[in-house]
Amino acid sequence: MADKKVVGVIKLQIQAGAANPAPPVGPALGQHGVNIMEFCKAYNAATESQKGNVIPVEISVYEDRSFTFVLKTPPVVELIKKAARISKGSPTPHNLKVAQITPEQVKSIAEAKMVDLNANDIDAASKIVRGTARSMGVTVA
């Protein structure tokens, strides 16, 4: 496995358990020569328990057209939308506030995202989550 050469890394955000060969998955994998259906089946099996979430995936493609993938945690935006029970953020976040979340919800989102965030402790991760919420028009109170 160590002597395989990586020829490409593809980053996608796909609905859990709902990967199919249609865009954006098909074209992104097709240009690297990956078996699209094989990836879709593997991804759907790996994300079966997380249906309803958008799960980022990082796919490493090797020179023999084989691949491996790593699943990440759902994006902060998706977690905030779920916590606030909204479908999208505010079109004008500084003027129009669309929802409110509690500091406890911010902390739980920060704990869930800690492995993927560039933060040293939970307070720094909470600040990142608060900033994302602010740019979506969601207040923390």
UniProtKB/Swiss-Prot annotation:
How is this chain modified after translation?
Answer: One or more lysine residues are methylated.
Q: Which UniProt keywords apply?
A: Methylation, Ribonucleoprotein, Ribosomal protein, RNA-binding, rRNA-binding
Source superkingdom? Bacteria
A single MF term (Gene Ontology): structural constituent of ribosome
Question: Per the UniProt entry, what are the Gene Ontology biological process annotations, in alphabetical order?
Answer: translation
Q: Which GO terms describe its cellular component?
A: cytosolic large ribosomal subunit
Query: What does this gene product do?
Result: Forms part of the ribosomal stalk which helps the ribosome interact with GTP-bound translation factors.
Q: Which family does it belong to?
A: Belongs to the universal ribosomal protein uL11 family.
Could you describe the subunit structure of this protein? Part of the ribosomal stalk of the 50S ribosomal subunit. Interacts with L10 and the large rRNA to form the base of the stalk. L10 forms an elongated spine to which L12 dimers bind in a sequential fashion forming a multimeric L10(L12)X complex.
Q: Which NCBIfam families match?
A: L11_bact (TIGR01632)
The protein's name is Large ribosomal subunit protein uL11
Q: Which organism is it from?
A: Tropheryma whipplei (strain Twist)
